[in-house]
């Protein structure tokens, strides 16, 4: 616990926030993954960055520091066993924009605390919210079965078929 407290960075996020706040005059980047985007912006704008670009980078910077703070906040809630804190911070990394939300006219995306859900789509169209809902429902049901012993079929988050291998 004391090692975690010692490693909480206060100065870095403060500098990032200050730069992001001053996006009218400052371009802030928070990741080496943004280098190429910044270089392209500078090349396309005679060595400068546009206000739209600076606003976008500011948004990403504030998102990054908010994410960092959320991880710390949730850590303290976990060690204090605070099941229902006054403010709950839900955070995640964008994994994938989905084909559509619960209904075709709605947008949706999958976020995760990790960078990968360890799900591989083998065939078919891009998944929708309903497809992911079915996947997670099937996984929840299958976890109650003995390992490698059965199959679960789900439609609209409702199990419509479960089989168990009698030889298991």
Please give the residue ranges for each predicted region.
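Alpha-helix C-terminal capping segments
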Residues: 17-22, 141-145
């Amino acid at each position: 616990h004391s090692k975690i407290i010692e490693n909480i960075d206060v100065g870095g996020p403060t500098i990032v926030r200050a730069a992001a706040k001053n996006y009218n005059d400052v371009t802030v980047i928070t990741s080496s993954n943004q280098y190429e985007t910044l270089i392209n912006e500078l090349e396309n704008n005679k060595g400068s960055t546009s206000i739209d670009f600076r606003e976008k980078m500011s948004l990403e910077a504030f998102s990054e520091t908010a994410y960092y703070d959320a991880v710390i906040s949730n850590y303290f809630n976990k060690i204090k066993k605070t099941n229902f804190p006054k403010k709950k911070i839900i955070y995640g990394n964008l994994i994938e924009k989905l084909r559509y939300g619960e209904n075709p006219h709605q947008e949706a995306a999958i976020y995760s605390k990790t960078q990968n859900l360890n799900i591989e789509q083998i065939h078919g169209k891009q998944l929708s919210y309903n497809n992911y809902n079915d996947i997670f429902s099937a996984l929840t049901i299958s976890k109650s079965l003995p390992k490698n012993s059965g199959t679960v079929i789900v439609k609209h988050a409702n199990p419509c078929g479960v089989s168990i291998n009698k030889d298991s």
